[in-house]
Each structure stands twice: as structure tokens, then as C-alpha cells.
């Protein structure tokens, strides 16, 4: 054995190399890293400084999407994935394709201006009958397969990628939290989120045959908190959100929204 090898052995270089290789294999098996960063999560920039690899950034965003309750089926989907020709089930939209194209334009417009909207700088938009109004909150109405959940999920992800705080709320789960006496702590957390988040999205809004007596009070409470925040809210329903019996807060939240009807094939 050469003197250099003896010296490396004394310093434990071989052991260090082995540990590094084992660590790399572990990261590979866990699906962490990529060939670009040699499974370390970091690369070296042109000026010689360490930079986070794109694979690590995506992992970071996935964790944020999970915390924001974004349905996993829509992770990494974007506005560009909106299909103007068919609905979610592949049914041809026919004459409604023109409406779908307008929806795509609206989503692109909203996404481009999302940062300003969350900062209280509302862009103006010309819509039906050439009416011009400032755009902040939107209420999307549509049937099953019209793309409501897709839109909800991609806009939340877009906000997160822009370093904005956003969260996706499923109506069924939200109602359960607000009407369960044992979930008061969670209900209080929801209230604080409605006060502070840059963007709140509620998907799947519908009327149930029976509503808990406390629903009106709690829904009114969080609705008023959201209105007073001055920040945008996106609502997604099958078209009967106005019929939900509750207080003035919920009705005011609905009235603050620009109502958009999505193309739908029965």
C-alpha cells in the first residue's frame, strides 16, 4: 500500500467516502434529489455559489401544497392545462367552447394580477355587456365536471409559487369543523386564517338537506372576517350558494364576488 493510501486511511477518508455514497444511495431510494445535483439537492452556480436545485424547490412546493390542502390529483397543474375543447370527463363542449376560451383568458388575467390583487391593487376587467369593474373575489358556478376543483387547485398553487399565503378549503370539511363542538380550536384557527391569508379558496359549496343550528353563526363569523381582511376569496359552487340560509356576512361575501358561470355539458 502506498504512503498516500496509508495517510488517507489514518484520516478516515475511505470511511467518509463510504458514508457519502451510502447517504447518496439513501436519498436516491427515498426519491430525493436528481442527477443534476448528484442527489444532494444543491448545484453550483456560475459564480461558484451553492444554489438550490430545481428538484429540491419542487419538493419544497409539494410540502406547501400539502399544507394548503391542495388535492393531490391537481399538484403541478397550471392554468395552461385548462382544456378549452372538453370538460373534465372528455365531453366535447361544442358551442360552449367559446365560453371555455373566455374562462381561460380570465384565469390567465387573474393569475397575472394575483400579486397586486392580494396587495389591494385591483385590476379592472370588462365583462358581460361591456361592464367594467374591479376584480378581487370571484364566485365560479358550474355543474359536475365543469372544472371548479381544477381552477381552485391551480390558483392556490400559483399563489404559493408567488410567495403568497393561500389555502384550499373543501366545503364539506369546512362545515364539519364549524359545526362540531369538539373542534372549537380548529374553528378558531379557520377564523384566524380567514383574517390573515392572502387568498382563501372554498370549493364544493352546496346546500345540504339538514344544516346544523350553529352553521349560520359560524359561517357568518368567518365570512365577515374575510370581508374585513380586504383580500381575495374564490368560491366554487353548483349554483345555489345564494340559497344557503345564513347571516349577512355570507350574503355580503357572495355579493362582493364577480359571478362567473363555467361551461357545462349535461
Language-model features: locations:
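A short, basic N-terminal segment
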Residues: 1-105, 259-260, 264
Amino acid at each position: 500500500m502506498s504512503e498516500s493510501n496509508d495517510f488517507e486511511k489514518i484520516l478516515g477518508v475511505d470511511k467518509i467516502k463510504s458514508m457519502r455514497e451510502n447517504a447518496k444511495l439513501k436519498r436516491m431510494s427515498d426519491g430525493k434529489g436528481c442527477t443534476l445535483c448528484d442527489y444532494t439537492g444543491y448545484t453550483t452556480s456560475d459564480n461558484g455559489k451553492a444554489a438550490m436545485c430545481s428538484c429540491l424547490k419542487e419538493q419544497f412546493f409539494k410540502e406547501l401544497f400539502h399544507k394548503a390542502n391542495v388535492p393531490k390529483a391537481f399538484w403541478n397543474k397550471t392554468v395552461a392545462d385548462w382544456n378549452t375543447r372538453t370538460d373534465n370527463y372528455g365531453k366535447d363542449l361544442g358551442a360552449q367552447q367559446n365560453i371555455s376560451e373566455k374562462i381561460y383568458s380570465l384565469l390567465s388575467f387573474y393569475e397575472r394580477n394575483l400579486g397586486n390583487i392580494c396587495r389591494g391593487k385591483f385590476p379592472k376587467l370588462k365583462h358581460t355587456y361591456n361592464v367594467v369593474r374591479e376584480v378581487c373575489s370571484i364566485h365560479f358556478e358550474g355543474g359536475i365536471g365543469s372544472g371548479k376543483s381544477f381552477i381552485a387547485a391551480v390558483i392556490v398553487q400559483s399563489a404559493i409559487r408567488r410567495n403568497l399565503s393561500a389555502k384550499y378549503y373543501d366545503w364539506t370539511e369546512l362545515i364539519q369543523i364549524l359545526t362540531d363542538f369538539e373542534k372549537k380550536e380548529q374553528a378558531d384557527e379557520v377564523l384566524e386564517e380567514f383574517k390573515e391569508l392572502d387568498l382563501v379558496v372554498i370549493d364544493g359549496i352546496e346546500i345540504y338537506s339538514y344544516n346544523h343550528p350553529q352553521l349560520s353563526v359560524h359561517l357568518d363569523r368567518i365570512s365577515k372576517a374575510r370581508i374585513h381582511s380586504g383580500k381575495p376569496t374564490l368560491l366554487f359552487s353548483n349554483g345555489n350558494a345564494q340559497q344557503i340560509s345564513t347571516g349577512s356576512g355570507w350574503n355580503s361575501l357572495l355579493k362582493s364576488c364577480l359571478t362567473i358561470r363555467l361551461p357545462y355539458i349535461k
